[in-house]
């Protein structure tokens, strides 16, 4: 049996890091990556050169890592070109973007619903970054939806006017400063994996198999399981350090089958809290997400027990579920941030 093989996934309830409580998230983007970032940063070796995030979305993991100053830089990418265009504006000129958003926020007040529809039409024709920022701030529960032609088609949230201009400015400027020196680009995840060096770490968060077999309106494109497995085989063979969120469960609904055991990946089951998608549908369902750790990264971190030990609660370690002797050090900034947070995470859309 290989070092990273286990018959059953390791079950863990991730602890939140106090040091991530004030990460400046620029984009209101539905999903669980903000919670998972508390896990990912614990698994980044102290010698990490670059964090690669090829399914960027809200770039929550890149923001968390750079907020804690882990690694030299972050390179995040996506095949969603308008989204990357927005991120490039945030990196290059957050003040001008904030000014434009502020003007739009004021202009909408005469007829918010009609203004939203007008901006949505313009965005689908022009793909301007400021249009996308406004739509993300104003759409229902920050839940992005696309039609079969790839056009943004989510409706307006009639309960609110979106993030206030002063607060949006603060988020954009702080996110830009946090990501200083980072790069955003349009790229296929397979190319990103091919660029990785031995001291890089890639975090992959592709559409799950359960939402990729058919056209899912949350993504501009799906991802066939066979393609992703082939990419993982190549990444393992090349010795790439990576983490991948793939299959999972929300309530009774299962998203996809586990990745093949013969890949030799360490399989963790993480309690990700209440599903934001279920909440949007008026339901309450606990979410369990799978996180896979590549053999190369497990070796860099000192072995399976040491990986689990970075994530397990003290009581789990005391019961002998994990080892502790000889554990490679965490990045200093992660150690400083490791006190637990009692208050629950809140979704971006619920913040003032």
Feature-to-residue mapping (PLM):
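Class I S-adenosyl-L-methionine
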Residues: 1-75, 79, 182, 187-196, ...
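SAM-dependent nucleic-acid methyltransferase catalytic core
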Residues: 2-42, 46, 93-203, 207-215, ...
């Amino acid at each position: 049996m290989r070092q990273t093989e286990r018959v059953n996934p390791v079950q863990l309830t991730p602890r939140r890091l106090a040091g991530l409580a004030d990460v400046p998230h620029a984009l209101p983007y539905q999903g669980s990556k903000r919670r998972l970032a508390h896990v990912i940063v614990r698994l980044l070796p102290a010698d990490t050169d670059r964090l690669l995030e090829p399914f960027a979305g809200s770039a929550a993991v890149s923001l968390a890592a750079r907020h804690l100053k882990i690694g030299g830089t972050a390179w995040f990418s996506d095949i969603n070109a308008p989204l990357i265009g927005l991120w490039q504006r945030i990196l290059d000129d957050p003040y001008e973007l904030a000014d434009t958003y502020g003007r739009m926020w004021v202009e909408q007040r005469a007829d918010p619903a009609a203004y939203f529809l007008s901006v949505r039409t313009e965005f689908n024709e022009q793909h301007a970054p400021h249009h996308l920022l406004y739509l993300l701030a104003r759409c229902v529960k920050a839940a992005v939806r696309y039609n079969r032609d790839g056009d943004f088609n989510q409706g307006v949230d009639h309960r609110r006017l979106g993030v206030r201009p002063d607060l949006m400015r603060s988020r954009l400027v702080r996110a830009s400063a946090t990501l200083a020196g980072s790069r955003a680009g349009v790229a296929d995840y397979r190319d990103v994996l091919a660029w990785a060096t031995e001291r890089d770490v890639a975090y992959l968060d592709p559409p799950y198999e359960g939402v990729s077999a058919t056209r899912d309106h949350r993504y501009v494109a799906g991802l066939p399981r066979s393609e992703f497995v082939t990419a993982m085989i190549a990444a393992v063979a090349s010795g790439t350090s990576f983490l991948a969120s793939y299959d999972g469960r929300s309530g009774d609904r299962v998203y996809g089958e586990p990745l093949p055991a013969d890949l030799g990946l360490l399989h963790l089951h993480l309690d990700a809290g209440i599903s934001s998608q279920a909440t949007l549908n008026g339901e309450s369902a606990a979410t369990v997400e799978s996180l896979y750790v590549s053999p190369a990264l497990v070796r860099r971190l000192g072995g399976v027990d040491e990986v689990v030990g970075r994530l397990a609660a003290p009581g789990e370690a005391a019961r002998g579920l994990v080892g502790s002797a000889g554990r490679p050090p965490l990045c200093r900034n992660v150690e400083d941030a490791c006190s637990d947070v009692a208050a629950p995470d809140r979704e971006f859309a619920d913040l003032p």
